[in-house]
Amino acid sequence: MTLPRPTSPHIRGPLRTPAIMRLVLGACVPGLFTLTWLYGAGTLLNLAWAGLVALACEAAMLALRKRPPGMFLKDGSALVTALLLAVALPPCAPWLLTLVATGFALIFGKHLYGGLGQNPFNPAMLGYVVALVSFPLEMTRWPSPGSAPGLADSLHAFLGLAVQPDAWAHATALDVLKTDRSLTVDELFAADPAFGHLGGAGGEWVNLAFLLGGLFLLWRRLFTWHAPLGMLAGLFAMSLLFWNGSGSDSHGSPLFHLFSGATMLGAFFIVTDPVSGATSNRGRLLFGLGVGVLTYLIRAWGGYPDGVAFAVLLMNLAAPTIDYYTRPRTYGHRKAERGFRRGD
């Protein structure tokens, strides 16, 4: 008699680091495609150069730390940092800007603290802030979505072989809203090509693309909903609280802030970093909420049009304190403590 031999149930373990990084890279493809479609091939040049610099810095730092380069280079974390920087930097950025941002992110943002899993700050945002402070003019050169340069022009700008025309230095919607106080918001949306239907022209489609990729990662359970929802809720609440209609002194509607700048990139690909963020679910919610509130404060009254990077770094500083006050209670801990004090 033949007895049936059913397979025993198996518990599927967590994804390994290379698999997680591949999913993140894949989720960024819609945003990368949209950026390339709207702003030209400069984003792809940024990605290729940032990827090479990231791998070179990773290999050099691993050699200095006497770590096996093969295993760590294959985990994909350096490429994820390079990709996040490539989509955050202007498509017409010169090669030196991308080199400085990527090198600083890998060397000082990651390996200075011990490598993957030890960094207190998000490496990509640290590199972005360094580029923003070191290259303030170059970081404002975003081309207009309707006049994106071709591959040859993008390559010349990347190598610094040609002077960039004025059409490549178009102000973003956040720039215009922050500096132009002579027109109402409705007049700006109607007159300035930087504005689209929901947010910035082009920027709204980029945000929708990153929202799509972020929802895919959420569906694959690479992170929980707490940090993204906290950031979007904080930004929405602050913009709703200080929104005074469409007057000339308005800072924009809640919908405008949700679909402008790096909102969705930050909500689903930056604040969800498991290393530099909070660890408990309640802590992640507070962490994201703080990023959203600080992002609005910087956009409305700070010195920079978009404040996602600065907000993330400031909340990275607060993450240990958030973890301290939001530690999950150990089951039965307080009951056992009271029983011990009574002498039971």
UniProtKB/Swiss-Prot annotation:
Enzyme class: translocase
Species of provenance: Pseudomonas paraeruginosa (strain DSM 24068 / PA7)
Domain of life: Bacteria
Record InterPro entries: NqrB/RnfD, RnfD_bac
Keyword field contains Transport: yes
Residues modified to FMN phosphoryl threonine: T172
PANTHER family named among the record's database cross-references: ELECTRON TRANSPORT COMPLEX PROTEIN RNFD (PTHR30578), ION-TRANSLOCATING OXIDOREDUCTASE COMPLEX SUBUNIT D (PTHR30578:SF0)
Protein name (Swiss-Prot/TrEMBL): Ion-translocating oxidoreductase complex subunit D
Recorded name of the encoding gene: rnfD
